């Protein structure tokens, strides 16, 4: 479960926060406009955040990664944005 402290720490200058509650956070990067769904799963040995991603609002989500914390997932998203903004070649659908 995400704590209020974790939710309050989300960088609102970097992200548009669409949803933020104890189990789900939906963000849109203001840099790439990619949409991210972060879902908290409670497991017997701790928690994991499953990260879903889509490039456009009209696209379906796909699984992007898993992280052990909300903070780590957000750092990974920012790293992905840097990868996108530093010249990643566009992926073309076949």
Residue ranges, per PLM feature:
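Compositionally biased, intrinsically disordered low-complexity segments
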Residues: 20-22, 28, 38, 44, ...
